[in-house]
Amino acid sequence: MTYLLLALAIVTEVTATLLLKASNGWEKWEYGSASIFFYSLSGIIFAAVLKNMGVGVAYAIWSGMGIALITAASVVFWKQTFDMYAIVGIMLIVSGTIIITSKSAVVFQ
C-alpha cells in the first residue's frame, strides 16, 4: 500500500508540474490554480507515505521518478530535446531509484 500511495504522490506532483508549465507563467491562471491543488494533494499523500517509509528513501524515489516522468512528458507535449549528458544523467537517477527500491534495507525504517 505504501508504494501505491507513493506512486499516487508522484503522479499528482508530475501533474502539478505539467499544469504549471501549461499555465505559461500564470498567463493561463486556470492551469496555475489547478497546479496548486495537485501540489497540495501530492504533499498530503506524500505525508501518508512517510508514516511507513524513511524520508530519505521516499524522497529519492519521489524526486527520481518525478524527474523521469516529467522529462518524458516534456518530450511528448512540448517536443523538448535532450543531449547525451542529460539522457545519461536521467538514466543514472532512474538507476539509483531502482537500486534503492530493490536492494536497500532502509526503505521502511
Where do the protein language model's features map onto the residues?
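Polytopic alpha-helical membrane proteins, predominantly small-molecule transporters/carriers
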Residues: 1-109
